Amino acid sequence: MKRLHPHFRWKEFVVETLVRMTGISAIFFVLLIMIFLFREAAPAFLEVPLEDLFGTRWYPIEGFYGIVPLLLGSIWVTIGAVVLSVPLGLATAVFIREIAPGWVREILKPLIEILAGIPSVVLGFLGWVVVAPLVQDWLGAPTGLTVFTGSLMLAYMALPTIISISEDAIDAVPKTYRDGALALGATHWQTIWRVVIPAARSGVLMAIMLGVGRAIGETMAVMMVTGNAATLPRGLASFQIGRASCRERVFSTV
């Protein structure tokens, strides 16, 4: 076996060291962020009693800091976005990779990736102007700024991530898997749902996790289409979050 020249071994050592230092620095910066957040947030837990912090009233100007409405509102909106985006995103990825003709795939793939780059402020404005009135008419609510509207916008924002990564995971499944299933008498749909998707399960789960992470981390669009008021949603019939008061809007802006 031919031995590597010392010059190549030295270059390999440098590259390996740089990669290792990059990974360690990423972990170090994340730890610094966590320490900074803990240091800045610790006084809040000392000044505000836990029973007030986990209360149901959020009026910071009047001294009420209950975060339960904020948590429940975020959970409701995220669950709605996941329910809407995951089935649609997976079905679209299957269509693009397994069903659509080549020329359709060449059009849809770049278009979906472009949609992922639309700023959240633009999507929030479109949701406020276009989607909210439609939801208001459909639900018969006093306003279209509802949890459902927020879920629709978050689902739209998570879809490009779920579709793109799921499509890549499905494309990575070896062609021999498909040929073997078809040779055993499986139909095209049976091959997709019982062979291809299970084989791409890890990539699909990663796509869902990244899409959900995008939905959870979004703030601006949700604030614009849900009314920016911290009130408790009380079910599908009253999915309205409501419109923030003037003082609440001023406080949230500050």
Ranges and model annotations:
Residues 2-18, 38-81, 101-105, 249:
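Periplasmic/extracellular loop-to-transmembrane helix junction in inner-membrane transport proteins
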Residues 4-7, 80-112, 133:
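Transmembrane-helix boundary motif in ABC transporter permease subunits
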Residues 28-31, 74, 78, 82-90, ...:
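Hydrophobic positions within alpha-helical transmembrane segments of bacterial inner-membrane proteins
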Residues 70, 74, 110-113, 117, ...:
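Residue-level signal for discrete positions within transmembrane alpha-helices
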Residues 113-151, 155-158:
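Generic hydrophobic transmembrane alpha-helix motif, especially the helices
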Residues 119, 184-185, 198:
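Glycine/proline-centered hinge or cleavage motifs at structural transition points of membrane proteins
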Residues 165-166, 170, 188-226:
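Transmembrane alpha-helices
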Residues 215-249:
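Glycine-rich helix-loop "coupling/hinge" segments at transmembrane-helix boundaries
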